[in-house]
Amino acid sequence: ASVIKNYQLELDYLDVGGGYYGIFHNAPTFDEYAEAIYESLQKQGLEKLTIIVEPGNALTAAAFSYYSRVIDTKHLPDCILLTTDGSRNDVDPFFRKERYMTEIHREKEEAEVVPLQIVAGATCLEYDQLFRLENQPELCVGDMIEYKNVGAYTLTLTPMFINYFPRVYSLSSDGMKLIRDKWTAKEYMQKSNI
């Protein structure tokens, strides 16, 4: 706000960008961000200036869950390797996350507890390991893994390497509605002149 005054700028609006984490514990709330921005502008007599906020990830990350299904299991001497129909590309396009908020949806209620399971994606890339389960009931083909709080950028940054774009559903009080069907080679090639 002081820069606006010092340089006598006449602005129609001020874009304060993004990077707000109001949904996470021990982070300022959206109200606290708004109050801090307003107080700074008010000190300079700019409280009527239009503010544009780009909260993106802070709002939409919590609005999305991503589901993948176990499609194969391989019993190795020291662990069970689980291959899913999803990929780390779909839940972590910047490859920075060390943990995911997950919930397992099992087809069978009871399963044997096993020492180590490694959940991997469907690509052949070495970084496509999603997480490890230690001393948990064994997952089987058909079990679903829900990744919570993903989606802010994953819908636009997911590469079409091995897997094409997944189905996208909207959930409301009226129920679930398919808003984008899963892509196939047909959609991938639709604008190509080969």
What positions do the PLM features span?
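Active-site loop/helix belt of alpha/beta enzymes
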Residues: 1-73, 136
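Charged (often Lys/Glu-rich) extended helix/loop segments that serve as interaction or gating elements
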Residues: 36, 50-194
